[in-house]
Amino acid sequence: MGQKVNSNGLRFGINKNWISRWTASSNQQTATWLVQDEKIRNLFFINYRNAQVSNVEIERTQTTVDVYVYAAQPALLIGSENKNIQKITKMIQIIVGRKIKLDLTINEIGSPMLSSRIIARDIANAIENRVPLRSAMRQALTKVLKAGANGIKVLVSGRLNGAEIARDKMYIEGNMPLSTLRADIDYAFEKAKTTYGIIGVKVWINRGMIYAKGLNRTPAHILHPQKKQLKTPTIKKTNSVIAKQKLTGSDIETASLKALTDNNQNHE
């Protein structure tokens, strides 16, 4: 099951919080709010790609909408003299309606290389810029593992390098327990638009295990840092001849007698 389903959806309600949190009063309102949430997310993911938006969470009541944006470069969303954020607020207000009270919060993420969406977008951008596929995937693997991830899996599908027949290419590094529900697996999918067609990019990142109860937004690699390995004790070298040379039987007897004599003198 872990290999088939969306890794985020499998963990919602267990160790991941829902990205849309609201209760609609009717089926019609449910459909309306779902479309609005998708438009709000596309506003950030498509129009503000340079800001490296990792996630957009939305909370609603009947009269209010709270939008939480997590980005690697929030300054690009805010803009000089708050011009961009004012523009974004107006666009979201048009989507949800003028009568709804809107609250927009922009947060900076500490480890952008541990976000699957940012990594997938980087690979898609590299493919669109005609970077060799193998090097683009290898660079992504190296960045993620250096950032402290326990494992990463990358799957690219489509007409790779302009081939006539579509195929898949996959790289896996480290540990990737997709069926372990307490594992903090972050999954994202992006599209690279090329002259040969659309190439799909899927990224899974293993950020460690979550043992705490409840829905915690703090990444596992911060909650449970890996223990440092203890250094092996060093043995001090002695100045005795026995430790440095191969000794004969008579030499060993002489050395042991000398050690006994020194011992007796110390006791006296």
Swiss-Prot record:
Species in which this protein is naturally found: Mycoplasma genitalium (strain ATCC 33530 / DSM 19775 / NCTC 10195 / G37)
Role summary: Binds the lower part of the 30S subunit head. Binds mRNA in the 70S ribosome, positioning it for translation.
SUPFAM superfamilies xref list: Prokaryotic type KH domain (KH-domain type II) (SSF54814), Ribosomal protein S3 C-terminal domain (SSF54821)
Stated name of the protein: Small ribosomal subunit protein uS3
Keywords carried by this UniProt record: Ribonucleoprotein, Ribosomal protein, RNA-binding, rRNA-binding
Quaternary context: Part of the 30S ribosomal subunit. Forms a tight complex with proteins S10 and S14.
GO cellular component: cytosolic small ribosomal subunit
Domain of life: Bacteria
Similarity-based family: Belongs to the universal ribosomal protein uS3 family.
Keyword Ribosomal protein: yes
RNA-binding found in the keyword field: yes
Family matches, as InterPro entries: KH_dom, KH_dom-like_a/b, KH_dom_type_2, KH_sf_prok-type, Ribosomal_S3_C_sf, Ribosomal_uS3_bac-typ, Ribosomal_uS3_C, Ribosomal_uS3_CS
GO molecular function annotations of the record: mRNA binding; rRNA binding; structural constituent of ribosome
